[in-house]
Swiss-Prot record:
Protein role: Oxidative deamination of D-amino acids.
Catalytic activity: a D-alpha-amino acid + A + H2O = a 2-oxocarboxylate + AH2 + NH4(+)
Keywords on record: FAD, Flavoprotein, Oxidoreductase
Gene this protein is translated from: dadA
Pathway entry: Amino-acid degradation; D-alanine degradation; NH(3) and pyruvate from D-alanine: step 1/1
Residues where FAD binds: 3-17
InterPro entries in the record: DadA (IPR023080), FAD-dep_OxRdtase (IPR006076), FAD/NAD-bd_sf (IPR036188)
Protein name as annotated: D-amino acid dehydrogenase
Record's signal peptide: none
């Protein structure tokens, strides 16, 4: 089977890897000069298998109003003329109830835990390295209210058998001694020992190289213009003015996926959630994080790679704008100076922004569509790196009509469709047309 994958970020590349292993002929196209150069380029570096949560959570609507007036708000909204922005925000607000939060988080945890297993197996098989650390992650609470609010998440962690530790300030120093140099005295923390860290871009590029050795063809500098449709089936895509035919197409274009799907009448509720990062050369390892910490107040993570510190986070709903906002840089600098002063060289920091493809409920969109031969792997929001290996392996099983290792409930786009169209997974959409 010939599979055309649109997009070579971490999601498209892991999809290519697993489809190649399943015996498919795989072609990957991307508009950039290499793999992982857009949203996957400089994300937070967290593999947050346990700390997987939707932005749509109880209390967020009231917090969002307060954040409108805060300089260092973790979530900000810049109104645009795009009506889709307001539709997406309204849908997100509907998912902020405790009941919907529990459902959405459980779906995300299911995929994240599967992704952890998939990444461990992939790493063992290939020996791939990506400046990774297996030392857990820590969520830091500045207030008792934040610590008390973690009870809801702890209940779900317990339900899924995910190990965790609630740390006192004294216990916190044992795992992250560098915090002692900071100006903040945290009231407590939640540690997830099975979480990891690593450079997403490095992983993506090295996995692309391994996939290429398996015969996967990567074509860069390619603009995807539209999908080719023949009745109920997608038969390929127009790329740089030429038709590239395939038995199956996978849309892994992140925030740009809805733009490609709209002409087919598919309204995918994925919208850009703009994030920011600052990568610093490390200048004092003793004052740097051991792994990753997340400051809950600002939704900013500080992550250690081999010789670099990555400070990343926040969410700005501002459409497809990729300009660098100096105010966001000041927030990143403020947090790292608060928490780990002197760990990195702020004067030589690389400031970056990326558009994270977010769904209103936080769960990605993976699987079939109403069109035969068209599959999606997008909408992972801030957790694309975390969920990438599991998403790629799960999608390969779907396309190749193999039994999936996790439940497909709530993962495909049909949870959004008010339609009588049956999910074509039931009729093996992966089977190529008869010649």
């Amino acid at each position: 089977m010939r599979v055309l994958i649109l997009g070579s970020g971490v999601i498209g590349t892991t999809s290519a890897w697993y489809l190649s292993k399943a015996g498919c002929e795989v072609v990957v196209v991307d508009r950039q000069s290499g793999a992982g150069l857009e949203t996957s380029y400089a994300n937070g570096g967290q593999l947050s298998f346990g700390y997987t949560s939707p932005w749509a959570a109880p209390g967020v609507p009231l917090k969002a109003v307060r954040w409108l007036f805060e300089r260092h708000a973790p979530l900000s909204i810049r109104p645009t003329t795009d009506w889709n922005q307001y539709v997406w925000l309204a849908r997100m607000l509907r998912h902020c109830s405790a009941e919907r939060y529990a459902v959405n988080k459980s779906r995300m945890l299911r995929l994240s835990e599967y992704s952890r297993e998939a990444l461990e197996a992939l790493s063992a098989e290939t020996g791939i390295t990506f400046e990774g650390r297996r030392l857990g992650t820590i969520q830091l609470f500045r207030t008792q209210q934040q610590l008390d609010g973690a009870v809801r998440d702890i209940e779900l962690l317990t339900q899924y058998g995910i190990p965790y530790e609630v740390l006192s300030p004294h216990q916190l120093a044992k795992f992250e001694p560098g915090l002692a140099d900071g100006s903040v005295r945290f009231v407590g923390a939640l540690r997830l020992p099975h979480d990891q860290t690593g450079d997403c871009c490095l992983f993506t590029q090295r996995l692309a190289a391994l996939a290429a050795k398996r015969g996967v063809e990567f074509r860069y500098g390619c603009t995807v213009q539209r999908l080719e449709v023949d009745g109920p089936r997608v038969t390929g895509a127009w790329i740089n003015g030429a038709l590239e035919r395939a038995d199956c197409c996978v849309v892994a274009l992140g925030s740009y996926s809805p733009l490609l799907l709209a002409p087919l009448g598919l309204r995918l509720p994925v919208y850009p959630l703009k994030g920011f990062s600052l990568t610093l050369p490390m200048i004092d390892a003793s004052r740097a994080p051991v792994s990753t910490v997340l400051d809950e107040s600002y939704k900013v993570a500080v992550t250690r790679f081999d010789e670099r510190i990555r400070v990343a986070g926040m969410a700005e709903v501002s459409g497809y704008d990729v300009s660098l906002n100096p105010r966001r840089r000041s927030t990143l600098e403020m947090v790292v100076q608060d928490v780990y002063p002197g760990c990195g060289d702020l004067g030589r920091g690389e400031f970056w922004t990326g558009l994270r493809p977010a769904t209103p409920d936080g769960t990605p969109v993976i699987g079939a569509t109403p069109y035969q031969g068209l599959f999606l792997n997008t909408g992972h929001g801030t957790l694309g790196w975390t969920m990438s290996s599991g998403s790629g392996r799960y999608l390969a099983d779907l396309i190749c009509c193999r039994p999936c290792e996790i439940s497909s409930e709530g993962l495909d786009m049909f949870r959004y469709l008010v339609s009588t169209i049956p999910c074509p997974q039931e009729c093996a959409p992966c089977v190529p047309p008869t010649p």
